[in-house]
Amino acid sequence: NSWEEIQRMQRDYPDVDIAVLKQPGKGKGDAVHHAFQQAKGDILMILDGDLTVPPEDMIKFYNVLASGVGEFVNGTRLVYGMEKNAMRFLNYHANRTFALIFSYLLNQQFTDTLCGTKVMFRSDYEKILANKSFFGDFDPFGDFDFIFGAVKLHLKVVEVPVRYRARTYGSTQISRFRHGFMLLKMVIFAFKKLKAI
């Protein structure tokens, strides 16, 4: 029902410049890449539509980029406390574990590699896209496309803590075990690319 809801929002707010796009493929990663290629600004932002991260937090991400403190800004949900039921117990510990693993593999500190909230310059996004083939094309969410790409380009990576809330809209499309297995495959692939002799 998301498509109808988005169209309704566009009709209800005619004074706001809302672009409505339909992705050609499937998955969040495909949707983000499609939207970024249509976007007009010099700064590109990802904010998940389930409102687990307040839209008001995006100003903090913008300020990090605009001030030159960082060139790739990644959200982290695991610094502040979070609302009850915002993240399942198993997901919480899996997120922490994957953050430690990818921090080691990438030689870059991450506390939350799977937070959907990310901000970057368009020019850096275009470079990340051009280098995407180095790490393959099997990330359905796009998080690792951006993280791997940013680290490979030696961008200044900064994490911004967000207050993670229980979702107020929609239902999760993430399968813990199927997508968890996919993440394990990414770990092995990244190890071979980055650490194996």
Please identify what each model-predicted range represents:
Residues 1-21:
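Acidic donor-binding segment of Leloir-type glycosyltransferases
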Residues 4-7, 33, 59, 148:
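Active-site phosphate/pyrophosphate- and oxyanion-stabilizing loops and adjacent acidic/basic residues
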Residues 21-24, 47-49, 160:
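Cofactor-binding loops of NAD(P)H-dependent oxidoreductases
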Residues 35, 50, 121, 150, ...:
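Residue-level signature of catalytic and energy-coupling elements of molecular machines
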Residues 47, 76, 163:
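Conserved residues at the C-terminal ends of beta-strands
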